[in-house]
Design a protein with these regions (language model features):
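N-terminal beta1-alpha1-beta2 submodule of the flavodoxin-like/Rossmannoid cofactor-binding fold
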Residues: 1-91, 148-166, 171-184
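Mobile beta-alpha loop/short-helix "lid" or hinge segments that flank ligand
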Residues: 34-45, 91, 124-144
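Repeat-unit-sized solenoid/scaffold elements
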Residues: 71-76, 101-111, 138-144, 173-177
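His-Asp phosphorelay/catalytic-motif detector in bacterial-type signaling
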Residues: 94-95
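Short, glycine-/small-residue-rich phosphate/pyrophosphate-handling segment
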Residues: 98-139, 149-156
């Protein structure tokens, strides 16, 4: 289950949030994970077709049953590079679970970004869970080194991961056992 850090900006607090979520995923038994940073992907910005696909990311998504996206809210939306990266791996997303972690300096914690990203993920074939994590006022949740300042925040991440892993297992069962257009 890759954790996709969805912004390339310098000084990004989203990186700390992504690392925290990733570390919590690593604690889960039987779950393979890796942190994928859009800033380091070799994806050309002038091509959104098959030629823009990063083979390593495609292979990661082929193996994955779920995807965690961690992204900040920029002007009520999501980062453009995140959208570009998502657009390059269309077949690999079909019938896989997705969970979104929003990050913002304000009180909404990326909620408006999440609202805008959900229909995009649905169009790509991902199935989003209903539970999100919102890092509201991120500077009061994480210090300048990325350490969590409020341990009571961890149960939110745990509930999010519980829901995401349940959905991932359910969708994996469906992909493996229920023919498309068929019945169980």
């Amino acid at each position: 289950m890759p954790v996709l850090l969805g912004t390339p900006r310098k000084g990004r607090m989203s990186e700390y949030a992504a690392r925290l979520v990733w570390s919590e995923v690593e604690k889960r038994q039987g779950v393979e994970t890796e942190l994928v940073d859009v800033a380091t992907l070799p994806i050309p910005v002038d091509d959104a077709g098959e030629g823009a696909k990063d083979p390593e990311l495609a292979e990661t998504m082929n193996r994955a049953d779920a995807l965690v996206i961690v992204a900040p809210e920029y002007n009520h939306g999501y980062p453009g590079l995140l959208k570009h990266v998502l657009d390059t791996n269309l077949p690999e997303y079909i019938h896989k679970a997705a969970g979104i972690v929003g990050v913002s300096a304000g009180v909404f914690g990326g909620a408006r970004m999440i609202q805008n990203l959900v229909p995009v993920l649905r169009e790509l074939g991902l199935v989003t869970i209903f539970w999100d994590v919102n890092f509201t006022s991120v500077h009061s949740r994480l210090d300048e080194d990325g350490a969590l300042l409020d341990e009571t925040f961890l149960p939110r991440i745990e509930k999010f991961l519980d829901e995401l892993l349940w959905m991932a297992a359910t969708l994996r069962y469906g992909r493996e056992n229920v023919p498309l257009g068929g019945s169980a």
